[in-house]
Structures are given as structure tokens and as C-alpha cells.
Amino acid sequence: EQDKVSPAISTLQKLLKVYGLSLSEFFSEPEKPDEPQVVINQDDLIEMGSQGVSMKLVHNGNPNRTLAMIFETYQPGTTTGERIKHQGEEIGTVLEGEIVLTINGQDYHLVAGQSYAINTGIPHSFSNTSAGICRIISAHTPTTF
């Protein structure tokens, strides 16, 4: 403890045996805690949707993140269901197809290339009333999932 004694190899071997470690494990650097991912692969997206609506959350493992991004796919004739509300803001862009956004009692028909920006504290829903698939990319803050 005061750098005055150097343990014998036999003592070190006994300690390693007790702790179930190899010599290389004993002298290796401790593992760093998991860092949030910088690159997120498609296979790592978290599926949150159901009933013909796919909602894939981009999540990097950071529990303190303040922004959420979701890839949304609506099959023909599907909806998010009852109008929901949650704290925050949401913006999105229709990448393919068309969608009906219902908010504050009003329907908005959006097509590919159009975007929306809403206060998510107001009850809202999305419905694909068309015969084709609709794909949307959206961002939400603060994160609610």
C-alpha cells in the first residue's frame, strides 16, 4: 500500500484464482460505460406501432435525450385511432403517399412533400384514407417515448 512491498508471483496467482481472473483480465482497463450510439442502424430502430401502422423510433441509448425521431408507415385504410394529446411539439414531412391529420376538429389532407407542425397538447390523429402506403418522418420534443 505504501509502495514498499512487491507481491510475489505466487501470491498474485493465488489472488487471481480466488477472484477467477486471468492475468490479462487483472491488468486490463475497466470497460467504459455504454456511450450513446452515433450511428443507428435500421435494425436498431424500436417498433412502437400496431394494427397496420408502423412507428419506428430512432433511439441512441441516451436516457437524457430531449428529441425523438420516428419513421412512420401507414398501410391503406389505417389510423392512429382515437385522438391523442401529449406535452410538446411535433413536426413531420410526408415522404410518400398521403395522410389526413385531424387536429382541433379540423382535417388537413397532406401529400408527399408537405410538412406539418403541431402543438401535441391539442388532441390529434392521423389516418391513411387512400389506397396507397403513406410514409412520414417526424420529430417530437420533448420525448414522450
What would you call each of these model-derived segments?
Residues 10-25, 31:
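DNA major-groove recognition helix of helix-turn-helix/homeodomain DNA-binding modules
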Residues 45-82, 139-144:
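A short glycine-rich, His/Asp/Glu-containing loop-to-beta-strand
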Residues 25-57:
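Helix-adjacent hinge/juxtasegments
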Residues 105-120:
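Short acidic-glycine-tyrosine-enriched beta hairpin
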Residues 82, 101-102, 108, 124-130:
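Short beta-strand His + acidic residue motifs that chelate non-heme Fe in jelly-roll/DSBH
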